[in-house]
A protein has these predicted regions:
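Short secondary-structure junctions
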Residues: 45-55
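Short secondary-structure boundary/capping segments within folded domains
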Residues: 2, 47-48, 65-69
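Catalytic "initiation/cleavage/transfer" segments centered on a nucleophilic residue
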Residues: 1-45, 84-191
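Histidine-centered divalent-metal-coordination microenvironment in nucleic-acid enzymes
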Residues: 55-94, 118
Length: 191
């Protein structure tokens, strides 16, 4: 998407290894993971206090697995800027190092999915058996209602997957067969 679109909402990912090492894996900044984590927290708090961002939620992922071990610590964020900005401006403000690490989240569906991904409670993350992070690991400022955001829109809430339909159909079939459920009762369960 061209950089002429302005929006308030963005998702951001920052990575410890990428911010402290060059492409050849040589150390460029000699700080520990804990120091980096505190630096990111202070940076975001400062942006919030300065009024440049209205609200945000972030979480540090340090338990994500690769085939070779654990993925380097990284942070995921959902940020509402105080004023609409182009992606390049948001990237510069939020410390994104790559176009891939800062993305638009102006649609409610994008925010719902991104907020669920913070904890790894998206269907895709759970199917991939990713570590589920606890809500107590979230860092939130500005009163962002993460539960409301996770729910998304009414349309999204009513969308169910094919496997969920299969499970429901099987359950209703068994109840009709075993308990003599009527068509009317089955419809009530469906709707």
């Amino acid at each position: 998407m061209a950089d002429n679109k302005k929006t308030r909402w963005y998702t951001v990912q920052r990575n410890y290894d990428f911010e402290t090492h060059d492409a050849d894996k040589n150390v460029t900044r000699d700080i520990t993971e804990d120091e980096w984590r505190e630096e990111i927290k202070a940076f975001m708090h400062e942006l919030y206090e300065s009024g440049k961002i209205k609200q945000y939620a972030m979480i540090f992922h340090d338990k994500d697995k690769l085939e070779t071990g654990f993925k380097p610590i990284h942070v995921h964020m959902i940020v509402e800027l105080s004023a609409p900005a182009r992606k390049s401006a948001a990237m510069a403000l939020l410390g994104g190092s790559s176009d891939k690490n800062v993305d638009y989240a102006d649609e409610k569906g994008a925010r719902a999915g991104a907020s669920r991904y913070l904890l790894h409670v998206t269907e895709k993350a759970m199917q991939a058996d990713k570590h589920i992070y606890g809500e107590d690991e979230l860092i939130i400022e500005g009163g962002l209602d993460i539960h409301k955001m996770m729910k998304g829109t009414r349309k999204q809430q009513s969308t169910i997957t094919y496997s969920e339909v299969e499970k429901l159909a099987l359950q209703l079939s068994l109840e009709i067969e075993e308990n003599g459920m009527t068509v009317k009762q089955a419809r009530q369960k469906l709707y």
